[in-house]
From Swiss-Prot:
One of its GO terms (cellular component) is ribosome. One of its GO terms (molecular function) is structural constituent of ribosome. It comes from the Bacteria. It comes from Psychrobacter sp. (strain PRwf-1). Belongs to the universal ribosomal protein uL29 family. HAMAP family: Ribosomal_uL29. Disulfide bonds: none annotated. The keyword Ribonucleoprotein applies. The keyword Transport does not apply. Keywords: Ribonucleoprotein, Ribosomal protein. One of its GO terms (biological process) is translation. This is Large ribosomal subunit protein uL29.
Length: 64
């Protein structure tokens, strides 16, 4: 999802999306640990998405 699309969402929607991404991150870590993860680039992309969502939540809460 693009950052411009994320900026249009409310804090509640972003929080829900953050929960989903964190669950995905857990699943990716488990797949990596068991050797079932074929595409390792997904781990980095997921971490980046989580960071972007957290940044936007923080910006919206601070009123920036």
């Amino acid at each position: 999802m693009k950052i411009s699309e994320l900026r249009d969402k409310s804090v509640e929607e972003l929080t829900g999306l953050l929960d989903e991404k964190q669950l995905d991150a857990f699943r990716l870590r488990m797949a990596k640990a068991t050797g079932q993860l074929g595409s390792t680039h997904e781990v980095r992309a997921n971490r980046r998405a989580i960071a972007q969502i957290k940044t936007l939540i923080n910006e919206k809460q601070r009123g920036a």
